[in-house]
Amino acid sequence: MANRRSLEVSAAGGRVLAGYLTFGRRPGDSSARTSRPGPGLVVDYAPDGRAIGLEITAPSVVTLHAINEVLVALEQAPATADELAPLFVVRGGGAVVGTPG
């Protein structure tokens, strides 16, 4: 069975503050430990060692490439720009709030 992913985004005042990419969590899954594979990224692991999600704590400095390096290392399919588009929003004044590259 393929893992289903979903993206949750926290924003305030027109700015994206954080994101969480969930990897097909099972009922009752909770984070038992974390790792920090790079700046602005935190991987959550279930008690059995499975990666269950990726916290994007600094979307303004994290790139799609950096996220995909972590996903591939976790044996997850790379994300597309469309999948993560809510993280990389352009505000009304033209200021980029995230960096897709």
Where are these regions (language model features)?
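Intrinsically disordered terminal and processing segments
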Residues: M1-G40, A46-P47, A58-H65, A73-G101
